[in-house]
């Protein structure tokens, strides 16, 4: 083995990612032109993760259910409740923060031509239609709701198959997992390319005009990540939640921050769940499910930007409306993965609660795209790290009760 490979094997992946991050920042500041050219490293890494994620979820969930033995327990229901509780709590935090530190937006008359869903019913309808999508189409377009539906259906059907068939499915699962491990080893190079090209292309100039709004958004996400989520985890596992919380933020959140894709971070979360020794039948389903419906960061984005528009227009907000907004934001956030453009294009839906016309609401969406470099990164980091955090908390709570 060459000396370089020996050093790489001895150095942890997180350390390598931090080195790649620092090198990317340095290159963007010193040689922006070269940094832009090296952006293809990030594109290749994200494309590889996105390519392998649907296949991984499909094979892993199908294998997990097909090889599930009678008497084995999975803990999906408590994890699902944690996802919903975490998303609603995040929306409440965002409402409180927006009331304490109201943001103002410079809304102009410029037209923004984007297509947003017309109501909550349409979002839910899109989710149902995604669930019954053609399986090949679902895999090609990374429709994880459709992929999960077909994986669960085939898994249940194959539970009655012969032992040989189930062994083949398990071997396929192991093969795909090995490919994912190889892809993840290239994370430092990918993040180096992503950071260097993003900073060289956008810089930080575009963000300076929205510092207050960004401070409220990022502050809410940090509060949820470092206070609310640990409180929920403590309630579940009844011991110091911070070692687990910080581990998930370090191992999952950092990668998600730079890939800006919950789907692309699924392999990272699955690998972390395996290292934590969690129940495979549980995490192989809960992690892809979390990437679809566990959207605390999206709930914060929808709430903060909606209330920023409300404060800018001078619309009064009473307590019942604030509570309703929290509920709507939580439901919309759960449907964010079913909408192209994610949480930002669901803002007009929340704005409709206050009678804000679509033209103004879409200007708020445009503001969201301007600050998206940081907003989307922080949102994805919170969403994705919470998937593995709540999965680990539920599994550890079950182990504590069984002991």
From Swiss-Prot:
Domain of life: Bacteria
Claim: Transport is one of the keywords in the record: yes
Any single biological process term in GO: serine transport
GO cellular component terms listed in the entry, alphabetical order: plasma membrane
GO MF annotation, one: neutral L-amino acid:sodium symporter activity
Transmembrane annotation, as ranges: 16-36, 45-65, 79-99, 138-158, 175-195, 214-234, 295-315, 327-347, 353-373
Catalytic activity: L-serine(in) + Na(+)(in) = L-serine(out) + Na(+)(out); L-threonine(in) + Na(+)(in) = L-threonine(out) + Na(+)(out)
UniProt key word Endoplasmic reticulum: no
Subcellular localization: Cell inner membrane
Family annotation (InterPro entries): Na-dicarboxylate_symporter, Na:dicarbo_symporter_sf, Ser_Thr_transp_SstT
Membrane topology (UniProt): Multi-pass membrane protein
Keyword list, A-Z: Amino-acid transport, Cell inner membrane, Cell membrane, Membrane, Symport, Transmembrane, Transmembrane helix, Transport
Family (UniProt): Belongs to the dicarboxylate/amino acid:cation symporter (DAACS) (TC 2.A.23) family.
Function: Involved in the import of serine and threonine into the cell, with the concomitant import of sodium (symport system).
UniProt protein name: Serine/threonine transporter SstT
Organism: Pseudomonas putida (strain W619)
